C-alpha cells in the first residue's frame, strides 16, 4: 500500500506531523510518496478548506467520488501542539480512529482526570465554528447560526451569554443588537502556534 502525504497543503506547523506519520508508515512496511495523486491512500492536513489547506478540498471530493480512503491529520483536541489527531475519512465524530475499547492508560499518560459534571456557572457560552470547514457542511452561514442561537437561548433562559467566535472566523459586531451578550475574543497564547485562551471558567453550558 502506498500513502501519499500532501504536505504542500498543510498548515505551517504540520511538517513534523507528516514526517512522523511517514516514519510510522515506513516502519510497518508501507510505501510513502509526497504530494502524488497516484497513492492508494491520501493523507491531508485538516478539513478546513481555507488558506494553505484550500487545495485539499479537491483531493477530498475526488476521494469521496471514488470511494478512496483519506487520512486526516490535525492538531489534537487535548494539549494542542503536543498531541495530534489521525482520523480515517474525517475528523472528530465523522472519523474512524481505530478500536474504541481502550483502557485508561493513555489518559493517565497525559495526566487527564475526568471531573464531575458541572451544574453551576453563570454564563451560557456560544462557541463559533469556521464556516469553511467540512464540519460545517450543509449548515447556514455562521452569522445566522449565532444569531439564531442567541435568540433561542434568550427565549428559554435569563442567563448572560458569552459569544466566543472562532479565531479565524470572527464575525465582527454581529451580537450588538442583543442585550446581555458579551463577546469574548480568543487571544493567542504567547509562544504557541495556534493555541488560544479558551477556558470554561464560570460557564454553565456550552453550545457549539
Question: Which residues fall in each region the model found?
Answer:
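A nucleotide-sugar donor-handling region in carbohydrate enzymes
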Residues: 68-139
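Catalytic donor nucleotide-activated moiety binding site of glycosyltransferases and closely related
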Residues: 7-10, 147-191
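Short, aromatic/basic amphipathic alpha-helical patches
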Residues: 16-25, 54-64, 173-180
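Short, solvent-exposed loop/turn segments at secondary-structure junctions
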Residues: 10-11, 48-50, 76-79, 129-133, ...
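Short, well-ordered secondary-structure micro-motifs within conserved domains or adaptor modules
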Residues: 34-64, 201-207
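Well-ordered, non-membrane alpha-helical segments in soluble/globular domains
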Residues: 14-21, 52-58, 140-152
Amino acid at each position: 500500500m502506498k500513502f501519499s502525504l500532501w504536505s504542500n497543503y498543510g498548515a505551517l506547523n504540520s511538517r513534523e506531523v507528516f514526517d512522523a506519520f511517514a516514519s510510522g508508515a515506513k516502519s510497518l512496511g508501507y510505501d510513502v510518496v509526497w504530494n502524488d495523486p497516484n497513492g492508494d491512500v491520501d493523507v491531508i492536513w485538516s478539513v478546513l478548506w481555507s488558506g494553505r489547506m484550500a487545495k485539499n478540498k479537491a483531493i477530498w471530493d475526488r476521494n469521496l467520488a471514488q470511494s478512496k480512503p483519506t487520512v486526516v491529520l490535525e492538531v489534537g483536541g487535548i494539549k494542542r501542539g503536543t498531541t495530534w489527531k489521525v482520523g480515517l475519512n474525517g475528523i472528530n465524530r465523522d472519523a474512524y480512529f481505530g478500536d474504541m475499547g481502550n483502557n485508561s492508560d493513555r489518559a493517565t499518560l497525559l495526566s487527564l482526570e475526568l471531573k464531575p459534571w458541572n451544574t453551576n456557572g453563570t454564563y451560557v457560552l456560544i462557541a463559533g465554528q469556521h464556516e469553511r470547514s467540512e464540519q460545517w457542511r450543509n449548515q447556514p452561514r455562521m452569522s445566522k447560526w449565532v444569531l439564531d442561537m442567541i435568540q433561542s437561548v434568550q427565549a428559554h433562559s435569563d442567563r448572560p451569554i458569552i459569544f466566543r467566535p472562532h479565531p479565524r472566523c470572527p464575525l465582527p459586531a454581529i451580537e450588538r443588537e442583543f442585550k446581555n451578550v458579551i463577546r469574548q475574543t480568543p487571544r493567542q497564547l504567547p509562544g504557541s502556534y495556534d493555541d488560544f485562551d479558551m477556558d470554561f471558567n464560570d460557564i454553565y453550558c456550552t453550545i457549539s
